[in-house]
Amino acid sequence: MNSNLLNTPIDYLKGLGASRSQIIKKELNIFDYKDLANFFPKRYLDKSKYYKIKDLPKFSCDVQIIGEISNITEIGLGRKKRLVAYFFDGEDEIELIWFKSIKWLKKSLTLNTKYIIFGKLSFFANKVSIPHPELELFKSENLKLRAKLQPIYPSTETLIKKGVSNKVISNLVKILLFEIKIKFKETIPDYLINELKLLDKNSAIYNVHFPENNELLSESIRRLKFEELLFLQLQLLKKNIYRKDKIKGYNFNIVGNNFNKFYNEVLSFELTNAQKKVLKEIRNDLGSKAQMNRLLQGDVGSGKTIIAFMTILIALDNGYQTCLMAPTEILSVQHYEGFLLMAKLLNINIVLLTGSTKDSIKKAIYKSLESGEVDIIIGTHSLIQDKVKFKNLGLAIIDEQHKFGVAQRSKLWAKSTTPPHILIMTATPIPRTLAMSAYGDLDISLIDELPPGRREITTVHRYDNNRLSVFAFIRDQINEGRQVYVVYPLIEESKNMDFKDLMDGYESLSREFEQPKYQISIVHGKMKAQDKEFEMKRFENEETQILIATTVIEVGVNIPNASVMIIESSERFGLSQLHQLRGRVGRGIHKSYCILMSGSKLSNESKLRIKTMTETNNGFLIAEKDLEIRGPGDIMGTQQSGVITLKIADLISDQEILIYARKCAKKILTDDKDLLNSKNSKLLKTYNHISKNKDLWSYIG
């Protein structure tokens, strides 16, 4: 069957009609036969079981009954009007109730005619009924068909209102598969199908819509999920191979004076085994003559920054400049100040460039950067401006890169004739499956060990009506010489109200902790950069005991004496944000605490987030739970979500299939990196199609 048939517009499907066709196109993005065939059910109903009314369960669930309508009556007036039919199975009776389409139903339903009804039991005022049941005229030949699993397709409110029911969609797919009998070209080679005992493509498509049995359904879903994840991994791994083969990088083969002096004379502690392992991986990349593209992951406080600095020293020892780009000015300043202390000991020239840098200083930086006098530049997105020119940029480090767009990162990479080595750092732990998908084209290093002596933070949840006891705890901590963060949410959609909450909180704390005994700093987005920096400095120098802030302190702030993090309206933060904020304390020798404040009314999702925070300090466990709650698109944001748009596979529930698909993709490309072997011809055709069209499911051979 040729591919033109699969490209046939759905308008030509028997019984669809122009009006419904337009609605389906608009609501479901189904435009042609292949789109409809690849519109997979979201779940299945088992309609093989029939109940007698006397044996119905005593709880709300789906049931199916065979019987006759013995009586029909209208009850109530206006909005309370409803149609009630009494359904008799030969022994007992149950009420069927409809609140909509009453006139049409009254004409359509026939007394003393045998029907099969299907619906959810409802219990109200000691009476059991079935609201809005599905009805079908009883035909003995239909019993065999109904014994199979029934597909339930994704829908929308508009579709339901316009009469495009699940039954309509299901019937359209039936016409497509059993009357028109469309066929798909196979995408997976025979040797893989045989080796992995996979169903062929067409059997999988047919059985995912209308499974013969549970076993075939499982095999069909497994086949289609594996296919989707295999081609995702082939794309990502081939991209990685291409970079290593074709994109040559600077060869940093010297470990010289800067690195050795720092390691032997300046570094005052032993690196963890995890840090040593990661440093070795980076050094291997830098000496491979290919461009490094590595993601460095590590939980809060795991020691990523020191690894970044040591990587910079290798670049400097080989005669190249480096840059570090961070998403916020506060984080840029923190990196600069931390690096400056170490750089001075090594006589390294380091500068800071942000939006608030004075014009005269900017001009001097531009000049010395282009001449090669500057060794390291740290900054925000200011680094990607056209005015910023390097003499020989050899290494670019990007911190919290998910907060930058692709275009911003590309501009940074373009500042060198030979692509600089790229090290991406994140303190936002990324679940393994998400890392394999969103960052599957990068090499990944993981610091999965905290330095010795790092103490766990005690996290508790307190309701707003416990505020006085929380104030008492803050006072005790301050009297012991500690400092306290109090963080408020600031969300764009409600920023005016959030700003008011922040200022109300400041006034409340000012009344409770009066001057001159207590000093309070406040930092928020409406302040000028220099004012923020001034208040942060006061807190860092222990001139103030309490810092009230919005999430501008989410990453990068390092105050070892701060031992308490109070997060107001904690139910409004995501898990990742809560974990990052908690990571601002516990950086010194003192026992530290995180207190999650909230109102008394919490959604189930909020309760789950708060419970997770109180039960673990492990950022990777938290990331897995966050993925489970929010899904991959929300976690990565719109800039990243495109790479993980999946039609049938799921990054949360299909981890085993994803890991296996990546393993298979690696083996295939190890043996045949360009997919030129004749046995991989199907893979190559499909891969080329995806590369061009960005969509596996539009491939029809």
PLM ranges: what are they?
Residues 537-547, 553-560, 565-568, 583, ...:
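Accessory helical-bundle/CTD segments and flexible terminal tails appended to RecA-like ATPase motors
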Residues 75-266:
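Upstream accessory/linker segments immediately N-terminal to the RecA-like ATPase cores of bacterial MutS
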